Structure formats: C-alpha cells, structure tokens
Amino acid sequence: MFSGGISLSGISVLQLSSCERKNMPFKISLAEWSLHRTIRSKKIDHLDFSDITKNKFGLSAVEYVNVFFFDKANDKGYLNEMKIRADDLGIKSLLIMCDSEGNLGDPDPKQRTKAIENHYKWVDAARFLGCHSIRVNARSAGSYDEQIKLATDGLRRLTEFAEDLGINIIVENHGGLSNNGTWLSKVIQDVDHPMCGTLPDFGNFKIEGNTWYDRYKGVSELMPFAKAVSAKSYSFDHEGNDTQTDYYKMIKIVLDSGYNGYIGIEYEGNELG
C-alpha cells in the first residue's frame, strides 16, 4: 500500500526519534492529498487517515481534503467520527483544503456570491473538527488588476463570515494567477484582514505551458502572510533529496520569515501515495 518513507529536506521523517522531532524548529503534518491514489482506489478510507498518519508515519497532525468527504460537510455524525478518531490518537486537525466549490474571484457577482456561500459549510466543519483554517483557491478571470479586485472581494467577504467562527481563510498558490507570488501577495494585502493569509506551496508555481514563476521568490513573497506551509514533492534522488526543489534553501526561506508552525508534507508523485 505504501512504500518508502516520508522525506523532508532529504531527511526521512520516520528515521527521527520523538526527541529529535521536538528539537526541530518547525512541526510536521501530513496532507491527505499525499494519499489520494490509495483513497480513490478504495484501498483505504478517508476515516482511516488519522490512524495511518499516526501509526504508519508517526506524525501527529493532519490536513484534510474536502473532496474525500465532500458530501459529509453537514453530517455531524460523520464529522464527529472523524473528530473522535483523531482525538483518540492524539492527532491535531489543522485545516481543510477546499476545492470544487466555485471561484471566489468569479467575474459574475452571483456566481462569486454562490462560491463564497458554498464555503460556509466547510468553515463550520473546520470549527467542529478543531481546525484553525480552511484552504481556499483564488481563481478569477479578466485582466491582472481586475482579478486582484475580484479575488479580494470574494476573500474578504468569506473571511468576514469565518471570523465570527474563529476560522482563518488561507489561500494556496493553486492555479491561475495565484501561482504568481506577486499577484497573490497583493491580493492578501488588499484583503487587509488578519484572518486571511496564505498557504505557500513549494511546487505550485506553473504559470502556463513551460513557464514557471521562481518558486523561491514566490515562497518568499507569500511567507509574511503564511498560516500553513505545504512541502510539495514529486520525486526523490537516491539520497532522498527532492529532485525539483532545493529543500535546504526552501526551508531556510520559511524559517527566516519567522514561521514556526506546521509544515505539511504533500506528495504528488507517481511512485508513492
């Protein structure tokens, strides 16, 4: 079902003792997307995620993905089962990554409002599970500046709703202009709300075709607003180092920003997960 270990910065997390992990300058969580192939193939169930995180990988914090329990957002019985399983294992539920709920920067005002309201149930679910945030997307359409205004509007309105429930709205570089660090940092600045921030992803900086935004520059731009971090990996060399990202350089950027929260392992390659 699973092969290999979980690596971060060329070091297998499974090789570290609990004492060594406690002395690390950051904490490690597991993003559920890392297991998307085994979940979608029905080899494991979403409800087993906490158990696998704890007993297979030795980690104690998780990041859920809404598409794996998409029809359960309002099912308190199901959410309670998730919560019980996590709590019984000492697992900390950090956030829910939310997709397929519309574009928060949709140029159509009605569609933008619908997208905002579609996320309300996930804010409620996050609060129930004890998460600090939901991760959303800032997709839009139009000119560069028009998309800034549209995404800012959608994010601000959703954040104002989530504020009353104590849940942060965090935006990942996850498609469209959000893969441009300058653009996304400008949007967050314009939202101008302490509960709206970023979730910098080490790998999602593809602009279009073979054009990529500099990932180190992008993460540097997004870290001042970060409330979570996604350590994206696709493949590793024989020494366990990521083949696309210099993790030593990237982790230094994260730590130099003053961030000391969780870094979520997110594997998106073809060999594991």
Predicted regions and their residues:
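N-terminal pre-domain/capping segments
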Residues: M1-F128, E146-K149, R156, E163, ...
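Acidic-and-aromatic substrate-binding clefts and catalytic sites of carbohydrate-active enzymes
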Residues: R37-K42, V65-G77, N103-P107, S140-E146, ...
